[in-house]
C-alpha cells in the first residue's frame, strides 16, 4: 500500500509514523516521514520536507540493526514546515506553534512559538562574458 501511494503522489510516509488530526501536505512531492516520527494536530508540510533519522543504531555485539528505538523527530501541534526543510533525530522536537523555513536543516529541538529560517546572502548576478 505504501509503495502504491508513493508511486502516485511522490510522498513517502512510513506506516509506523504517528500522525495527528488536521495534518496537511501541500505540493507533497518528495515528502519523507520516517517510521518513529510523531506529528501533532494541525501540522502543515510543503514539498520536499524530510522528517528522518540521524542513524539506525546497531547492536555492538552482533552488528545487527536494532529496532524499537526512537529515530525520527517529534513535531508538536500547529507547526508549519516549509519546502525543502530537513529535520533529523529521535530526540529532536519541534515545539508547538512554530514555523520552520524553507531549506532549513535541523538536528536539535526548538521551543514552542519559534521561527527558524536560513539567513542567506542575496544571490549575486554577474554579466556573462561574450564569446
Predicted segments — roles?
Residues 1-9, 130-131:
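Terminal amphipathic alpha-helical/low-complexity segments used for targeting or macromolecular assembly
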Residues 60-67, 83:
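Intrinsically disordered, low-complexity Ser/Thr- and acidic-rich flexible linkers and loops
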Residues 57:
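A contiguous, basic/glycine-rich beta-loop/short-helix subdomain that forms a polymer-engagement track
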Residues 1, 64-66, 107:
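Detector for methionine-enriched segments
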Residues 5, 12, 65-68:
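A general structural motif
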Residues 9, 14-15, 20-21, 26-35, ...:
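Left-handed beta-helix
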